[in-house]
Design a protein with these regions (language model features):
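Extended two-metal-dependent nuclease catalytic cores across DNA- and RNA-processing enzymes
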Residues: 1-159
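Long, highly charged low-complexity segments
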Residues: 161, 172-177
Length: 177
């Protein structure tokens, strides 16, 4: 089984009942950042880009791309601190974030660059013209839910610290069985 192989590789497994894996990762990454540790999160999940900072980077194994703060801007058109707003507008089917129909990545990045934040976009929604403006106004009530779903919690109570999760020595015997 996979879990036994992971343990045999010297990788600590951490499971928290009733807690999203993203929230566990976010909590550990922010604790590591606070402790001055560099963190690399291997994922192609867009919502993890909100965690990127001077010590937290993402590695997308599918594209082979490493994302630091500048890489997030290059890929999504907004800095990491605007990724929650970007995801709220664009949505993400893999994380069940509905977003606003007809608002794609470029439109969301344009609005966030122009208005500065989701709150400012909402406050000035009547100024946004065309069909996409109509869609935004028609979906204003669902934005708080999308925002909540897009936000990775970084305050989950965990009994492990980042230092406890250092890579261990592989169990060669277990791996060759």
């Amino acid at each position: 089984p996979l879990m036994e192989m992971v343990k045999a590789l010297g990788i600590t497994l951490l499971r928290e009942s009733g807690v999203e894996a993203d929230d566990v990762i976010g909590t550990l990454a922010m604790r590591a950042h606070a402790a001055g540790l560099d963190t690399l999160i291997a994922t192609s999940d867009k919502d993890m880009a909100q965690l990127v900072n001077d010590r937290i980077r993402l590695f997308d194994g599918i594209s082979g791309r490493m994302l630091d703060p500048a890489g997030v801007v290059e890929k999504f058109g907004v800095p990491p601190e605007r990724m929650i707003d970007w995801l709220t507008l664009v949505g993400d089917t893999s994380d069940n974030i509905p977003g606003v129909p007809s608002v794609g990545p470029k439109t969301a990045a344009k609005w966030l660059t122009e208005y500065g934040s989701l709150d400012a976009i909402v406050a000035r929604a009547t100024e946004i013209k065309g069909k996409v403006g109509e869609k935004l106004r028609a979906h204003l009530e669902q934005l708080p839910l999308s925002h909540q779903l897009a936000t990775i919690r970084c305050d989950v109570p965990l009994d492990k610290e980042p230092e406890d999760l250092q890579l261990g020595t592989p169990d060669v015997d277990a791996l060759t069985r």
